[in-house]
Amino acid sequence: MQFEWDEQKRKANIRKHGFDFRDAGKVFNSPMLVAPDNRYDYGEDRWIGIGMLEGRTVVVIFTERDDTIRIISIMKAMTYEKNKYEQHLRNQLGYD
């Protein structure tokens, strides 16, 4: 799996959210909950992924271009996103 990003957005994301796009692979190697990002018309299909990064629940906004995942943003998950992710994991494991 290959990743790409805009370098200026990566630096801005570190300043704003404290997460480096270079760590995106770790999130994609954990169980993820992925849904389409339909908040706006971006002119391309965007996805919202919730997963784990170094013990923290994070949200990754991304798009797929050919065989490459383009990272748009990584941020700490809000409480409702964390709860949704935890429920997804419980369902996957058959606990609910």
Residue ranges and their predicted role:
Residues 1-96:
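Ribonuclease/tRNase effector modules and their secretory precursors
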